[in-house]
Design a protein with these regions (language model features):
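Boundary at the C-terminal end of the N-terminal hydrophobic targeting segment
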Residues: 20-23, 27-29
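Bacterial N-terminal signal peptides
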Residues: 7-18
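Central antiparallel beta-sheet cores of small beta-barrel/beta-sandwich binding domains
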Residues: 29-33, 38-163
Length: 163
């Protein structure tokens, strides 16, 4: 009798857990679809800082024009991007890991190499509504980055430094 009850409890628990997991998978697929659609055709227009460098008077603009953003496999996403900061002005595919903190996506690079951008790159960048923010490290240099997510046609109005 006890074995029968334990077996029944296990079957019920397995059914509940599998339906919750299936629901989580559906919700995650919806979040990923929304993330890809929100960033494809968007422009990240913002500012970055360099630790140890006074930026009160010197605003360091950055601009990432995202042609497309697609999940590839195993948590990796490819951002087809035109990148502009400092003397960088390149268009290239950037494949990076994206992890999720609940419903919030975050690019999570750790001591990585990105073709066209260099090596020893680390970044943790979250995307929340119409904003992005995070930290970055490139070799000995690092800092913060933050800005707005705009549609490509709207963002051509003013560079980040003319606010």
């Amino acid at each position: 009798m006890l074995a029968s009850r334990c077996c029944m409890l296990f079957v019920c628990a397995a059914t509940v857990v599998s339906s919750v997991v299936a629901g989580d998978d559906v919700a995650q697929a919806q979040r990923e679809k929304k993330f890809g659609e929100a960033l494809s055709g968007a422009v990240l227009v913002g500012t970055f800082s360099i630790d140890g460098v006074k930026t009160d008077k010197l605003r360091l603009p950055e601009r990432y024009e995202l042609k497309s953003v697609k999940k590839t496999k195993d948590g990796l996403w490819t951002f087809m991007a035109h990148v502009t900061y400092f003397k960088q002005d390149v268009t290239l595919p950037i494949t990076v890991p994206v992890v999720w903190a609940g419903d919030t996506p975050m690019v999570s690079l750790s001591n990585s190499t990105l073709p066209g951008l260099g090596n020893q790159l680390s970044a943790k960048v979250i995307f929340d509504g119409g904003r992005y923010a995070g930290t970055w490290q490139h070799g000995k240099f690092g800092g913060h980055l933050w800005g707005k997510i705009e549609r490509a046609d709207v963002s051509k109005s003013k560079p980040a430094t003319e606010k």
